[in-house]
């Protein structure tokens, strides 16, 4: 049965401030709680809910919890419309507004803490689970298994953009919360997601590393599948995402060995070199040393050109994409160095 009324949803929205202090009791009739954080992406959320409503698992065996990290009445009405659309044919559906703190980590924590099942399934509002997603994952969670990672499919164009290729690489990693199942007791023992991470990827990697350190029994399956279409990012997205390097510093501080093994083997020395020769060129210009300035400019052009070539390799060579790569390759090294050093200072860690 689908439980939702507009009045109930509005009350939940208004009284969500204390929700993180409450633990919902386990309901033995509900085997799995699906947590879907959302950020005002109505079309994508609608597609995700449609896919969840079509699950082959019996509706009474699972519930759906939508956590709105940007609470507004548009998302509220979209979720409530599913009651009218599905009537009593669908699973229990809960809308939960997240008044803050915000971010994927906080939203996911709000969701699993009100879940009624012992098994928590995480996906994204942009993901489309296969009809047998839940039915395929549950048997893998045997008594001795703590968590399960499923398969994420990302349809990729023959010549993707550099950003899309990077997104595919991240989703092809061994752990991603777009398709993740975990026992509630494990989440409680670990304290859930670390809400200090504003970036979803950092919070996911942190939980993954904690599970590996625990150690938890983490299993991968190719049978539980979600599809996550690659979105078209705004122009210059690769530059704006550099600010997440601040969170990378915290991740490195918490898990230095695993960070070097699984994320980045060492500092991006090429960025530091490009910034250094640019600094030499500027300083030489100020001090009227034209020969040194010219050498610095040439070295900077060579380094920036090498970065452009690397980023364009195997990606789209459309005029718009090439222009974006050229401009952002000029900006990325100094901004990357700035945000990495900002993270190192903020979290007092030697992170380069």
Where are these regions (language model features)?
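Cell-envelope/extracellular polymer assembly enzymes that use nucleotide-activated donors
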Residues: 30-33, 63, 206
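N-proximal low-complexity "stem/linker" segments adjacent to membrane-targeting elements
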Residues: 2-54
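A recurrent flexible, glycine/aromatic-enriched loop bordering the glycosyltransferase active site
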Residues: 154, 166-185, 198-200, 206, ...
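Acidic donor-binding segment of Leloir-type glycosyltransferases
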Residues: 50-97
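Catalytic donor/gating beta->alpha subdomain of glycosyltransferases that bind UDP-sugars
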Residues: 194, 199, 205-261
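Short aromatic/hydrophobic "clamp" motif used to bind/position activated sugar donors
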Residues: 120
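Conserved donor NDP-sugar-binding/catalytic core segment of glycosyltransferases
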Residues: 128-160, 229
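Glycine-rich, basic loop-to-helix element that forms the pyrophosphate-binding segment
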Residues: 95-115, 174, 178
